[in-house]
């Protein structure tokens, strides 16, 4: 199923909690040699993928909702692509903000 994503669409991202220095968690796509921020349409999908993508046992991560417009702005400013993923971590869409 493909959903439309607009600036006012709420999506879910993974945030690395570092006290007062929380930030969006990003990954590197070795195939395309790009840094990206994974995002999800469903909170439980983000939670499922969090355990597989980021749980290293020492850093704290959590799922948070964000407006796509804010995510896109953050990604553009910091040189990231935005990848929309499904519950298995498969790429649904790659977006250059």
Labelled PLM ranges:
Residues 1-97:
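Conserved NAD+-utilizing ADP-ribose enzyme module
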């Amino acid at each position: 199923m493909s959903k439309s994503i607009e600036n006012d669409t709420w999506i879910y991202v993974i945030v690395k909690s570092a006290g007062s220095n929380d930030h969006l968690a990003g990954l590197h796509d070795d195939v395309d040699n790009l840094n990206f921020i994974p995002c999800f349409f469903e909170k439980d999908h983000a939670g499922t993928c969090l355990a597989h993508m980021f749980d290293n046992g020492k850093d704290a991560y959590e799922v948070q909702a964000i407006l796509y417009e804010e995510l896109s702005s953050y990604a553009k400013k910091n040189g990231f692509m935005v990848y929309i993923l499904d519950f298995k971590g498969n790429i649904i869409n790659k977006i250059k903000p």
